Amino acid sequence: MTEPIISINDLSVYFNKKKAINNVTMDFYPNEITALIGPSGSGKSTLLRSINRMGDLNPECTVTGAVSYNGHNVYSPRTDTVELRKEIGMVFQQPNPFPMSIYENVVYGLRINGIKDKAVLDKAVEESLKGASVWEEVKDRLHDSALGLSGGQQQRVCVARVLATSPKVILLDEPTSALDPISAGKIEETLYNLKDQYTLLLVTRSMQQASRISQRTAFFLDGELIEYSSTKDMFLNPQHKETEDYITGKLG
């Protein structure tokens, strides 16, 4: 059986001593899309951000338990969080391109890491924008401001910015919730194509999105992991009443 790329063991997350995640244990596997679903406040985004230690940015956040990435304890004092977030990248709910050109957005992380060779940067821009399925739409205006793009294009440029740093895992926190249906569909198609090269963890409020593109789905409620299975099993044969109530719209 395939070894998990990320293992979470007995994870609890607190904000100012209030528990947001309660003793969660689960594994994530390479080259899959795993959807995290649940009502607002269920803990799914908190869990996502615990994986690459984004919670460190909140002084009121405390974490207990373990998160392992490729066998390494993410919360070890020896962990370099900059390197960690390069390998486990993140795309947020609202498109957040920097106020600079499309080109400079994509190479931002590479420049921070000291890469100056124009040929290397040019190649990274083209490959990353192609990977994010937006190259054909922007290739003739790479030096225009990314802020002039549509919301869907901006979000795909943000995906490209993550891809340029060569991550192994991509965390996505409701990446289509601020987009129109056509733009959301393009993002979904992009994510589905990326799973052959990356591991993707997707927080979504859309049951249809989870069922369309994910291979596994986890259902959270009040900080608890209620159910975790293949997406097909989750939607066709849920094992818990709370899961069934949520995916059928009785709980939300």
UniProtKB/Swiss-Prot annotation:
Cell compartment(s), UniProt: Cell membrane
Gene Ontology terms describing biological process: phosphate ion transmembrane transport
Keyword Translocase: yes
Molecular-function GO term, any one: ATPase-coupled phosphate ion transmembrane transporter activity
Boundaries of every ABC transporter domain copy: 6-247
Enzyme Commission no: 7.3.2.1
Membrane topology: Peripheral membrane protein
PROSITE patterns tied to this protein: ABC_TRANSPORTER_1, ABC_TRANSPORTER_2, PSTB
Entry-linked Gene3D superfamilies: P-loop containing nucleotide triphosphate hydrolases
Pfam families cross-referenced by the UniProt entry: ABC_tran
Oligomeric and partner information: The complex is composed of two ATP-binding proteins (PstB), two transmembrane proteins (PstC and PstA) and a solute-binding protein (PstS).
Role played: Part of the ABC transporter complex PstSACB involved in phosphate import. Responsible for energy coupling to the transport system.
Similarity field: Belongs to the ABC transporter superfamily. Phosphate importer (TC 3.A.1.7) family.
Protein name: Phosphate import ATP-binding protein PstB 2
Native species: Streptococcus thermophilus (strain ATCC BAA-250 / LMG 18311)
